[in-house]
C-alpha cells in the first residue's frame, strides 16, 4: 500500500508524467530491454552489485534451523528480515562458506558413476604422455570429429528413451527400448544409480554424455579419434604442435576402427563370391563387433569410409552424397556435367571406352594425407590447388586429379597394355585401369603433362614433374598451397542404390562407390570381430578353415545327418564347404570327391555301416565336383601349416583325431566339439567291421576256431582268417585285407557275398 501511495504522488507531479509520456521510443526500448523478461541482461554487473549487498542470497526458511545465526568469527550469516514478496530468508555469502565447511555430508558413492566421463578423462590425461613442442606451419583442415570420448553411440532418440527410463521411470510417456545396447545400458544404469542423491537433471545431462556421439566440425592436423580431439587445444596451435599419446582408449574409437576393418574384410571377400551383394548382406548380418551385431552398429555409426558406406548402401541406409575415386572423397562444389560415352586411344594404341563428363565443374578432394581444390572442364584440368603432408602425399593427389580430368595427354602417357583385374579376376573399368597404371608409373604422366611459368601468389608455390617445389615453374595448372582444404561439412545423407557387384549409384545414376575404392590396408582390430559366416573363415588362414568346417558339421550334425541320408546333393552343395576346397590340392579334388561320394553311397546301401566319425571326417571332401574314377585312397591330403598333411580315411591323425573315451574331436590339436554317435554304433552288427578291410571268403569253416565277436575281430593280423558272427546269428569266414586301399570294393562285394555265404 505504501508503494502504491508513493507512485500516486509521483504521478501527480507534472514532471513525472512528462518523462513517461514524452521520452522518445528508443529510450523506451532500452528501458524495456533491461526490465522485461526473466533473462538477466547484464549478469556481470548484476553479480557485482548483488554481492555488494549484505544479504544477496535468498533461502528457504528451514535454513534458520540448519545454520547458526553467527559464525565462529561472530559474523551474521542470515538476516531476520524476510525477502520482499516471498517468504524466504535473506542470507549472507558467508553462510555458503559455513555450509561447505560444516554442513551435512552425503554419500559420494554415486559421484564416480554419474560423472564417469569426467573421471575417465582425468585418468586418460594422467596416463597420457606429452612430448616436445615443435614449431612449424600447421596444415589444418576442418573435419567432422567426435568430441565425446567414451560414448555408447546411441542415436539421440534412443538415448532419450534410455535416460527417461533410468532417471524418470515414473514419468508418463511411451518409451521404446528395442536395441540390445539400449536394454543392456538401461539395466546396468538402473542398478548403478539406485538411491542416487545427485539431482536428476544432472544425472540426465551426464547420461547423455555417456550415450550419444557429439560431433563438431573442427580444424585438425593429426589424429581425429575422440581421445585426441579432447586435447586438441593442448596439441596444436596456429604455428606449433605438441606430441601426445593418449593414456587410454575408449570404446567408441575402438568400435569405429574395428567397424572399418570388418567392413573392408567383408567387401573384399564378397567381391570374389558368385553373388557379391547377397554374400555381403549374409556376412554383415552374421558378424559381431565387440559382442554387438554389426548391422546395429552400421545403423547408428556415422563413420564415412568406403567399405562401411558400401555395407550401409547394401542395407538400404542413406549415405553421404560425395563420391570416392582413388581413395579421395570428391564433393562437387559448383558447376554441372552430363555423361557421354567416348572411345579414346592410349599411347599403346589400346582402345578405352570411358564415360566423359562434359561441362565445367569444381570439386574439393579430401584424402587422409592430402587435400585439393580441382577445377575442370570437359577432358581438361583447369586448376588444381593441392596441399599435403609431404611430396609423396601431394603426388598421390596430383595423379588422382590428372586421371580424373580425363585429359588426352594423360591417356597418351600410358605405356604398355592396361589389364588390371580385381580380386575376382574381372577387368577393372577404364578409369581404374588408368589410375592403377599411373600409381605404378607416374613419371611418364608428370613428364608428358607439361609445365608453365608461374606468378608469385601469396601462400602458393609451383611443383615440378619430379615433385620438387619451385617458385618459377610448375606442372600446368597445378599449384601447392600451404592451406588445407576443409572436408565437406554437411551431414546430409542421400538415398542410393547398389547393384549385385556392389557398385553404389546416386539417384542420377552416377557411380559414387565401388569395391575398387576399398583400401587394401590391413589393420588389427581393437575389438574382437566374430565372423559367423563361413565365407570369412579364410580370414585367419587355412587352419581356421579346417577347424571351422568341422565345428560347423558338429554343431549342425542333426540336420546334416538327415540330409546325408536323404538329399546328399543338397548337402554337398552347401556354401559352408566352399572355403575347405582351397585346402585340397587342385589335382586331387575331383578324385577325392568321387571316392568319398561312392563310399557314402555304399554306407547308405548297406544296413549297419553308418559311421558318424567317418562321415564327418570325409564329408567336406565330397563337396567338389566329383570325377568318376576307380581310384582308392587310404588317406586324403590337405594343405595346412605350409605343407600337405594327411587325414586317414580310417583312423586318427594329427589333423583329425576322435577320442572315443571322451567323445570329443580335435582338429589340428584344437577342440572342435563333442560327437554323439548313434546308439549301438560300432557294435551294430558285424557288417560295419566286415565291410571295411575284410574280405568275405564264404560259409563258416570250423578249422578257424569258434566264431569271433566284432570286437575280437579287430585283433586279426593282415591276411589272417577267422569265423565271424554277423547280423542275425549267421557265421561267415572272413580274411583281413592285406592292403588298405581296397576298402571300396569290400563294401561293394560284401553285400553280395554275405547273401551268398548265408544262403
Curated annotation (Swiss-Prot):
One biological process term in Gene Ontology: viral RNA genome replication
Keywords for this protein: Cap snatching, Eukaryotic host gene expression shutoff by virus, Eukaryotic host transcription shutoff by virus, Host gene expression shutoff by virus, Host nucleus, Host-virus interaction, Inhibition of host RNA polymerase II by virus, mRNA capping, mRNA processing, Viral transcription, Virion
Marked site: Avian adaptation: 627
Compartments where found: Virion; Host nucleus
MF-aspect GO terms: RNA binding; RNA-directed RNA polymerase activity
GO cellular component: host cell nucleus; virion component
Locus of motif Nuclear localization signal: 736-739
Pfam families cross-referenced by the UniProt entry: Flu_PB2_1st, Flu_PB2_2nd, Flu_PB2_3rd, Flu_PB2_4th, Flu_PB2_5th, Flu_PB2_6th, Flu_PB2_7th
Keyword Signal tagged: no
Primary location: virion
Protein task: Plays an essential role in transcription initiation and cap-stealing mechanism, in which cellular capped pre-mRNAs are used to generate primers for viral transcription. Recognizes and binds the 7-methylguanosine-containing cap of the target pre-RNA which is subsequently cleaved after 10-13 nucleotides by the viral protein PA. Plays a role in the initiation of the viral genome replication and modulates the activity of the ribonucleoprotein (RNP) complex.
UniProt record similarity statement: Belongs to the influenza viruses PB2 family.
Subunit structure of this chain's protein: Influenza RNA polymerase is composed of three subunits: PB1, PB2 and PA. Interacts (via N-terminus) with PB1 (via C-terminus). Interacts with nucleoprotein NP (via N-terminus).
This protein's name: Polymerase basic protein 2
Lineage: Viruses, Riboviria, Orthornavirae, Negarnaviricota, Polyploviricotina
Amino acid at each position: 500500500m505504501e508503494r502504491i501511495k508513493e507512485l500516486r504522488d509521483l504521478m501527480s507531479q507534472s514532471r513525472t508524467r512528462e518523462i513517461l509520456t514524452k521520452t522518445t521510443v528508443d529510450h523506451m526500448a532500452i528501458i524495456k530491454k533491461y526490465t522485461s523478461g526473466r533473462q538477466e541482461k547484464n549478469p556481470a554487473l548484476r553479480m557485482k552489485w548483488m554481492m555488494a549487498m549484505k544479504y544477496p542470497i535468498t533461502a528457504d526458511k528451514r535454513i534458520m534451523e540448519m545454520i547458526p545465526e553467527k559464525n565462529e568469527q561472530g559474523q551474521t550469516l542470515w538476516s531476520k528480515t524476510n525477502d520482499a514478496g516471498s517468504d524466504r530468508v535473506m542470507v549472507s555469502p558467508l553462510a555458503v562458506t559455513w555450509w561447505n565447511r560444516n554442513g551435512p555430508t552425503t554419500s559420494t558413492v554415486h559421484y564416480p558413476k554419474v560423472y564417469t566421463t569426467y573421471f575417465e578423462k582425468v585418468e586418460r590425461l594422467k596416463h597420457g604422455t606429452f612430448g616436445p613442442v615443435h614449431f612449424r606451419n600447421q596444415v589444418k583442415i576442418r573435419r567432422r570429429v567426435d568430441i565425446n570420448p567414451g560414448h555408447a553411440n546411441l542415436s539421440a532418440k534412443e538415448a532419450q528413451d534410455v535416460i527417461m527410463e533410468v532417471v524418470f521411470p515414473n514419468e508418463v510417456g511411451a518409451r521404446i527400448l528395442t536395441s540390445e545396447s539400449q536394454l543392456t545400458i538401461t539395466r546396468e544404469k538402473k542398478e548403478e544409480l539406485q538411491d542416487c542423491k545427485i539431482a536428476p537433471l544432472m544425472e540426465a545431462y551426464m547420461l547423455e554424455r555417456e550415450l550419444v556421439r557429439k560431433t563438431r566440425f573442427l580444424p585438425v592436423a593429426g589424429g581425429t579419434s575422440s581421445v585426441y580431439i579432447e586435447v586438441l587445444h593442448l596439441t596444436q596451435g596456429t604455428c606449433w604442435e605438441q606430441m601426445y599419446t593418449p593414456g587410454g582408449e575408449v570404446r567408441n574409437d575402438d568400435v569405429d576402427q574395428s567397424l572399418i576393418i570388418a567392413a573392408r574384410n567383408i567387401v573384399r571377400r564378397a567381391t570374389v563370391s558368385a553373388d557379391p551383394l547377397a554374400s555381403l548382406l549374409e556376412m554383415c548380418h552374421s558378424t559381431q563387433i565387440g559382442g554387438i551385431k554389426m548391422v546395429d552398429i552400421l545403423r547408428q555409426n556415422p563413420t564415412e569410409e568406403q567399405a562401411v558406406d558400401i555395407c550401409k548402401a547394401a542395407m538400404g541406409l542413406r549415405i553421404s552424397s560425395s563420391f570416392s575415386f582413388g581413395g579421395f572423397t570428391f564433393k562437387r562444389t559448383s558447376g554441372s556435367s552430363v555423361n557421354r560415352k567416348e572411345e579414346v586411344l592410349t599411347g599403346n594404341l589400346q582402345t578405352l571406352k570411358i564415360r566423359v563428363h562434359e561441362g565445367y565443374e569444381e570439386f574439393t578432394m579430401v584424402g587422409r594425407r592430402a587435400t585439393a581444390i580441382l577445377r575442370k572442364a570437359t577432358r581438361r584440368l583447369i586448376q588444381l590447388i593441392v596441399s599435403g603432408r609431404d611430396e609423396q602425399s601431394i603426388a598421390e593427389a596430383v595423379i588422382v586429379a590428372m586421371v580424373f580430368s580425363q585429359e588426352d595427354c594423360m591417356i597418351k602417357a600410358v605405356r604398355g597394355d592396361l589389364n588390371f583385374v580385381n580380386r575376382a579376376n574381372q577387368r577393372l573399368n577404364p578409369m581404374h585401369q588408368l589410375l592403377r597404371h599411373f600409381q605404378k608409373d607416374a613419371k611418364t604422366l608428370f613428364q608428358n603433362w607439361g609445365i608453365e611459368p608461374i606468378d608469385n601468389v601469396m601462400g602458393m608455390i609451383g611443383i615440378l614433374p619430379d615433385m620438387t617445389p619451385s617458385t618459377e615453374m610448375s606442372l600446368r595448372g597445378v599449384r601447392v598451397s600451404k592451406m588445407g582444404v576443409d572436408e565437406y561439412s554437411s551431414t546430409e545423407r542421400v538415398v542410393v542404390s547398389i547393384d549385385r557387384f556392389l557398385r553404389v549409384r546416386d539417384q542420377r545414376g552416377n557411380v559414387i562407390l565401388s569395391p575398387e575404392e576399398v583400401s587394401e590396408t590391413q589393420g588389427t582390430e581393437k575389438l574382437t570381430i566374430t565372423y559367423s559366416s563361413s565365407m570369412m573363415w579364410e580370414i585367419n588362414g587355412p587352419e581356421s578353415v579346417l577347424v571351422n568346417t568341422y565345428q560347423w558339421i558338429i554343431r549342425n550334425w542333426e540336420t546334416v545327418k538327415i540330409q546325408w541320408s536323404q538329399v546328399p546333393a543338397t548337402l554337398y552343395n552347401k556354401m559352408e564347404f566352399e572355403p575347405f576346397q582351397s585346402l585340397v590340392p587342385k589335382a586331387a579334388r575331383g578324385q577325392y570327391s568321387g571316392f568319398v561320394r561312392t563310399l557314402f553311397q555304399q554306407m547308405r546301401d548297406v544296413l549297419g555301416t553308418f559311421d558318424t566319425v567317418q562321415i564327418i571326417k570325409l564329408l567336406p571332401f565330397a563337396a567338389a565336383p566329383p570325377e568318376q574314377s576307380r581310384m582308392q585312397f587310404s588317406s586324403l591330403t590337405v594343405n595346412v601349416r605350409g605343407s600337405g598333411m594327411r587325414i586317414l580315411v580310417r583312423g586318427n591323425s594329427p589333423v583329425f583325431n576322435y577320442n572315443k573315451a571322451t567323445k570329443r574331436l580335435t582338429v589340428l590339436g584344437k577342440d572342435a566339439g563333442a560327437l554323439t554317435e548313434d546308439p549301438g554304433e560300432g557294435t551294430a552288427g558285424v557288417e560295419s567291421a566286415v565291410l571295411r578291410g575284410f574280405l568275405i571268403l564264404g560259409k563258416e569253416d570250423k578249422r578257424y576256431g569258434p566264431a569271433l565277436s566284432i570286437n575280437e575281430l579287430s585283433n586279426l593280423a593282415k591276411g589272417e582268417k577267422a569265423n565271424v558272427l554277423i547280423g542275425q546269428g549267421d557265421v561267415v569266414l572272413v580274411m583281413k585285407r592285406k592292403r588298405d586301399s581296397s576298402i571300396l570294393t569290400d563294401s561293394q562285394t560284401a553285400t553280395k557275398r554275405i547273401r551268398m555265404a548265408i544262403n
